[in-house]
Amino acid sequence: MKQRGERVDTIYEALRLAILEQVLQPGTKLPEDAIGEQFGASRTVVRRALELLAGEELVDIRPNRGAVVAKPSIEEARDLFSVRQDVEQMVVRRLCGRLTPADVKRLEAQIEAEERAHHDGRPEYIRHAAEFHVVLAEMCGSPMLLRYMRQLVGRSALVLGLYGRPRWTNCSVQEHRDLVKALATGDLTIVDRMMHDHLDAVLSRALDAASGDRERGIRDLLAPYAEAARSG
């Protein structure tokens, strides 16, 4: 049997993934009893997992009202992507012309996984697209930068889930592929412009899109994540 800390981590990771893949949409209620029932965990364990997500600003915990998936305003969305542009441009400046063949191969594999999921219409596409940016940050070798990027990517998923098309990332597979080529070539001017334009386009596409239906029950939404946690 898993220890309490492991169970907290399992539920935290499952909920975070469901938010990242836009299965749990902004504003979705997160009742401790329903989540605990789905994962076979106590409310205390679920509450701790929700507190970790609240620390990343992915969940809002309201006194006497329970937890919900965070719902950023348009102003917060614009501020988030402005900060993310600065951070990601710093990332690509560090990596420009410094990618090893192994780095390029890893990024290409990430893009291929993204493209396959996109072609099949699977929600994993969103996660793969987001992880592309996380992998770039990881390649910089800074644990602090990596943690910050994970938080920015998670908050971005809320923006895209709230204002974009349902279960979509608005990232372009081809834009990712072109960025890797430019990084490998080492042209800093092109790389800088490409990352700025890429993130600007992601936000613009999100804010131009219509929102979708978000009315499924929490247990139904989390069922595949609970099953994956049990089998893992």
Residue ranges and their predicted role:
Residues 52, 80, 86, 139, ...:
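Conserved catalytic core of Hanks-type protein kinase domains
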Residues 73, 81, 118, 149, ...:
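Short, flexible helix/strand-to-coil boundary loops that buttress conserved ligand/catalytic motifs
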Residues 166-232:
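C-terminal regulatory/effector modules of DNA-binding transcriptional regulators
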Residues 96-97, 141, 164-166, 211:
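Short helix-capping/hinge motifs at transmembrane helix termini and TM-loop junctions
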Residues 98-161, 172-185, 190-201:
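Conserved amphipathic alpha-helical segments that form helical-bundle/coiled-coil interaction surfaces
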Residues 54-60, 152-154, 168-170:
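Mobile beta-alpha loop/short-helix "lid" or hinge segments that flank ligand
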Residues 1-97, 207-232:
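Short linear motifs at protein or domain termini
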Residues 3, 7, 76-79, 83, ...:
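Conserved acidic
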